[in-house]
């Protein structure tokens, strides 16, 4: 028996999934109008002339809040399946989850003490 025998449909799906975006992007590039000018390189601001620079720097606090949100969002992602099958897992899985949660809580307390959650 060939070891990859059951993966035929996956390989076909993977090839099609790779070819569709490549063909769509290259096809649209081939049939697009080839016009260039200064208007094409200007930023679009609701049909009026652009005022000022288009480059805006965000404060680092936004990124800190986003990073902390992603961390705890991933925590929820891991805890939901565990909560569904909690009765079947036993005490070992419970202790592992307590260790996981304590590491995350220590990280939250560390970020809090460092002032990452303060907006001043």
Swiss-Prot record:
The chain crosses the membrane at residues 11-31, 65-85, 89-109. It is an enzyme of class 7 (translocase). Its main location: plastid. It is a multi-pass membrane protein. It catalyses: a plastoquinone + NADH + (n+1) H(+)(in) = a plastoquinol + NAD(+) + n H(+)(out); a plastoquinone + NADPH + (n+1) H(+)(in) = a plastoquinol + NADP(+) + n H(+)(out). It is found in: Plastid, Chloroplast thylakoid membrane. Its EC number is 7.1.1.-. Pfam families: Oxidored_q4. Keywords: Chloroplast, Membrane, NAD, NADP, Plastid, Plastoquinone, Quinone, Thylakoid, Translocase, Transmembrane, Transmembrane helix, Transport. One of its GO terms (biological process) is photosynthesis, light reaction. One of its GO terms (molecular function) is quinone binding. One of its GO terms (cellular component) is chloroplast thylakoid membrane. NDH shuttles electrons from NAD(P)H:plastoquinone, via FMN and iron-sulfur (Fe-S) centers, to quinones in the photosynthetic chain and possibly in a chloroplast respiratory chain. The immediate electron acceptor for the enzyme in this species is believed to be plastoquinone. Couples the redox reaction to proton translocation, and thus conserves the redox energy in a proton gradient. NDH is composed of at least 16 different subunits, 5 of which are encoded in the nucleus. This is NAD(P)H-quinone oxidoreductase subunit 3, chloroplastic. The gene is ndhC.
């Amino acid at each position: 028996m060939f070891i990859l025998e059951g993966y035929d449909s996956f390989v076909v799906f993977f090839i099609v999934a790779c070819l569709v975006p490549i063909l769509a992007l290259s096809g649209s590039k081939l049939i697009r109008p080839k016009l260039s000018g200064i208007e094409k390189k200007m930023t679009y601001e609701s049909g009026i002339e652009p005022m000022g620079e288009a480059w805006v720097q965000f404060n680092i606090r936004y990124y800190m809040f986003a990073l902390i949100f992603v961390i705890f969002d991933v925590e929820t992602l891991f805890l939901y399946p565990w909560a569904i099958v909690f009765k079947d897992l036993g005490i070992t899985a419970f202790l592992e989850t307590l260790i996981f949660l304590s590491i995350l809580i220590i990280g939250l307390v560390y970020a809090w003490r460092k002032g990452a959650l303060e907006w001043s």
